[in-house]
């Protein structure tokens, strides 16, 4: 189960953005939460909301790109096609820096962290 997704320097996001499923500050809805540890509970669903042009779609695009990249990494590692990352374009510095993605998740009771950075030419 996904605990957290982080990304940085992607489309309209220059700084790190975090999509977390960790439940904080929920008083009356505790019986709906998924226990991870005795002190950490996860939300069964998340919602992204905000004003028009606020970057909601770019959060979904970042997640989709990172998932597709991981799923197809072995197949695409031999191809010479450009990697479809789009760095933050509103300053010169960010365009030359890699885009970063990271997942924290749990499977069979074990907690994992997986992350990578990429430019259009190279994965780090």
Where would I find each of the regions flagged by the language model?
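P-loop NTPase switch/coupling surface
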Residues: 1-124
């Amino acid at each position: 189960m996904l605990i957290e997704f982080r990304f940085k320097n992607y489309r309209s996001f220059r700084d790190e953005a975090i999509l977390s499923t960790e439940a904080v500050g929920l008083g009356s809805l505790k019986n709906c939460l998924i226990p991870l540890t005795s002190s950490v509970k996860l939300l069964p669903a998340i919602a992204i909301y905000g004003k028009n042009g606020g970057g909601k779609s770019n959060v979904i695009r970042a997640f989709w790109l990172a998932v597709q990249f991981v799923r197809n990494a072995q197949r695409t590692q031999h191809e010479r096609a450009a990697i479809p990352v789009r760095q933050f374009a509103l300053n010169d510095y960010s365009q030359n820096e890699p885009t970063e993605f990271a997942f924290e998740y749990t499977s069979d009771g074990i907690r994992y962290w997986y992350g990578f950075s990429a430019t259009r030419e190279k994965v780090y």
